[in-house]
A protein has these predicted regions:
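N-terminal secretory signal peptides that target proteins for export/translocation
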Residues: 1-9
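Sec-dependent N-terminal signal peptides
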Residues: 9-21
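C-terminal motif of bacterial Sec signal peptides marking the signal peptidase cleavage site
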Residues: 23-26
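Ser/Thr-rich, Proline-interspersed low-complexity disordered segments
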Residues: 30-44, 52-106
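C-terminal active-site subregion of NodB/CE4 polysaccharide deacetylases
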Residues: 119, 125-221, 234-251, 259-262, ...
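Metal-dependent polysaccharide deacetylase catalytic core of the NodB/CE4 family, i.e.
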Residues: 164-184, 188, 234, 241-248, ...
Length: 509
C-alpha cells in the first residue's frame, strides 16, 4: 500500500505552480489572439474580483500582471499603473497664472485705517486725498476699494437744508466730586444752578449720540467770503450728513479754573500727558495730584475717539476764555508777574507757590492751547474780566476787549468768535447794523460770530457780515425744571430724568 502522506505537500505546490503557468500562458494567448486548451480548467479557485489565486490552504497570492503593451514584464497591481498619461498640451494653449498681489505693508495698513477714520467723520474728500498720496495706490486693490467705498458713502449724504435749525449747547467746567461741590458753603448755590457733573455730562453725550446728534464747527454753519470789491459777506455753509443725523455746536464757558473753585471738586488745569493727549490735573482733598478725563475737553476727545461719527470732520467745540485769572488753569495774567492789582485769590495762590515761574507758565499754556486746536477745539473771547458787554460803558468795553487781545489772544491765538459773558447780547435779538457802535467796534477787533444765551431750541441769525447763535445751558437749573414739571427745555436732546445726578441738592432754585 502506498503511503500518500509524503506526496500531499509536494503535490499541492506543483498544482499551484501549474496554475500559475497556465495563467501566464492564457495572458500570452489573449495578447496574440489565441485560446486556452481545455486542460486549463482546474479545481483551483480564481477570484475574478480581486485578481488573486486561492490555493487549497485558503491563502491568497497576488496575481502578477504584465505591463500593458509589454508582454512578459510584470507590474504592481496599483491603480496608478493604469492611469492614462496626460494629454499633450501646446504652449499656445497654456495660460499664464495671474500675478498675486503682495500683502499690505504696515504703512499701507496704517494709511487705510487713517483714511477710514476720516471717512467715519464724514470727511470723505480728505479720506480719498489721503489714499491718493500713496505712490502706486491704483495698483493696490485695498486702496482702490476704499476709494469706491468713500465715494459711495459721500453720494449717500444729504445737505442740511436749514442752518437756522442748528442748536448750540454749552456747559461750564464739570463737577468731578459732587460731595465737595455741594458742601453747603456759599458757592453751592451757583454750582447747583449753572454747573453739570461729570456723570451727567457722560450720559448727555451718549444719549445725544444715540439720537443722531453730530458735533459741527460754528464755521461749518456759515463763513465769511471776501467779495471782488473787498467787502465781506457771511454766506451759508454746506453740511452734508447721512440721513437721520443732526448737527449741533458745543461750547464751554470759563475753562480757566478760577481760584474760587479750588478745593470744591473741580479740575485745576489742563496738561498734556505722555501720549500727547490733553487731560486734566485734579488735586484730591489729601493733596494727591491725579490726571484724567475730568472735564468737557478730554471727555469729548475720548468719546470721539470711540465714536468718530459723533464729530463732523473733526469738530469738537468752542472754549470761551476770560483772562483775569489766566487761561486753562495757567496763571498767565501779567498781575501774577508784576503783583499789581492782585485779588485775594491771586495773592493766596502766589503765597502757596513760591516756585512760580511766569515765563514757564506762559510756555506751558501755549503748548496746551496748540494741542487743543490740533485736536479740533476752537477758542472764543469771553471778555477779559467776564464783563457784561451790553451794560458797561463803551470805554470799558474797548479796554476789556483790548486787554483780552493782549493777554489771552497772545497765548491761544486770534479768534473770530465772541461768546458774551452772562449771555448778554449787545443788541437783544434785533439784527446788528452799521449804526451799532459796539457791533462795529467788535467787528474791527476781528469778531464775526456772536453767541448769546437762549433757552429756545434755535436762534440763528445770518447777517450780511456776521452770524449770531443762541446757546442752551445744559445745567442743574434746566434739568430740574424738566424733571419737576415746570418746563422741559431739553426733551429734544435727552431725558433729564435719566441724566439728573442724585447727589444734587433739590430743589434747584
Amino acid at each position: 500500500m502506498i503511503d500518500t502522506r509524503r506526496w500531499r505537500k509536494p503535490l499541492r505546490i506543483n498544482i499551484a505552480a501549474l496554475v500559475l503557468c497556465l495563467c501566464l500562458t492564457a495572458c500570452s494567448i489573449r495578447q496574440t489572439g489565441g485560446s486556452l486548451p481545455d486542460e486549463s480548467t482546474d479545481t483551483t479557485e480564481e477570484s475574478e474580483l480581486s485578481g488573486e489565486l486561492i490555493d487549497d490552504t485558503g491563502e491568497s497570492e497576488p496575481v502578477p500582471t504584465e505591463t500593458p503593451g509589454k508582454p512578459g514584464v510584470t507590474a504592481e497591481t496599483s491603480t496608478e499603473s493604469f492611469t492614462e498619461p496626460p494629454a499633450e498640451t501646446s504652449t499656445e494653449e497654456m495660460t499664464e497664472p495671474e500675478p498675486t498681489e503682495p500683502p499690505l505693508t504696515d504703512a499701507q495698513v496704517a494709511l487705510i485705517e487713517e483714511a477710514d477714520r476720516l471717512a467715519a467723520g464724514y470727511d470723505y474728500d480728505a479720506a480719498m486725498a489721503l489714499i491718493q498720496t500713496h505712490e502706486g495706490f491704483a495698483e493696490v486693490s485695498a486702496m482702490t476699494e476704499a476709494l469706491v467705498r468713500y465715494e459711495n458713502r459721500k453720494a449717500a449724504t444729504v445737505k442740511w437744508e436749514s442752518i437756522e435749525e442748528i442748536t448750540h449747547v454749552f456747559y461750564h467746567s464739570l463737577i468731578v466730586d459732587p460731595v465737595l461741590a455741594f458742601d453747603g458753603d456759599e458757592d453751592e448755590y451757583n454750582y447747583n444752578r449753572v454747573m453739570t457733573t461729570v456723570e451727567e455730562f457722560k450720559k448727555i453725550m451718549q444719549e445725544m449720540y444715540d439720537r443722531g446728534y453730530v458735533l459741527v464747527s460754528i464755521h461749518d454753519i456759515a463763513h465769511i467770503e471776501v467779495q471782488a470789491d473787498g467787502s465781506e459777506v457771511m454766506v451759508p455753509g454746506e453740511i452734508r450728513l447721512p440721513e437721520g443725523k443732526i448737527p449741533y455746536v458745543l461750547s464751554v464757558d470759563d475753562p480757566s479754573y478760577y481760584h474760587y473753585m479750588e478745593g470744591d471738586g473741580f479740575a485745576s488745569r489742563l496738561v498734556i500727558d505722555e501720549m500727547g493727549n490733553v487731560v486734566c490735573e485734579y488735586i484730591q482733598p489729601d493733596g494727591t495730584v491725579v490726571y484724567g478725563d475730568f472735564d468737557v475737553m478730554p471727555l469729548v476727545d475720548r468719546f470721539v475717539e470711540a465714536h468718530p461719527d459723533a464729530s463732523y470732520r473733526g469738530a469738537k467745540g468752542i472754549l470761551a476764555l476770560t483772562g483775569y485769572h489766566g487761561v486753562l488753569g495757567y496763571r498767565t495774567d501779567p498781575a501774577y508777574q508784576n503783583h499789581q492789582g492782585l485779588d485775594a485769590g491771586q495773592q493766596a495762590w502766589l503765597a502757596a507757590h513760591p516756585e512760580f515761574d511766569y515765563e514757564k507758565e506762559i510756555e506751558e499754556a501755549k503748548r496746551v492751547a496748540e494741542a487743543l486746536k490740533a485736536s479740533g477745539w476752537e477758542f472764543a473771547s469771553h471778555s477779559y474780566g467776564h464783563r457784561n458787554y451790553r451794560d458797561i460803558s463803551m470805554h470799558d468795553l474797548m479796554w476789556d476787549s483790548n486787554t483780552w487781545r493782549n493777554t489771552v489772544a497772545s497765548i491761544i491765538g486770534e479768534t473770530d468768535i465772541l461768546i458774551y459773558a452772562y449771555g448778554a447780547d449787545i443788541n437783544g435779538t434785533s439784527p446788528y447794523t452799521a449804526e451799532n457802535e459796539r457791533f462795529m467796534y467788535l467787528k474791527e477787533m476781528g469778531f464775526d460770530y456772536f453767541c448769546n444765551v437762549d433757552a429756545n431750541r434755535y436762534f440763528v441769525q445770518l447777517g450780511d457780515n456776521y452770524l449770531r447763535q443762541g446757546r442752551r445751558n445744559l445745567d442743574g437749573i434746566r434739568m430740574w425744571q424738566a424733571i419737576s414739571g415746570q418746563k422741559d427745555w431739553l426733551s429734544d436732546l435727552f431725558d433729564a430724568g435719566e441724566v439728573f445726578d442724585p447727589e444734587r441738592p433739590t430743589p434747584v432754585r
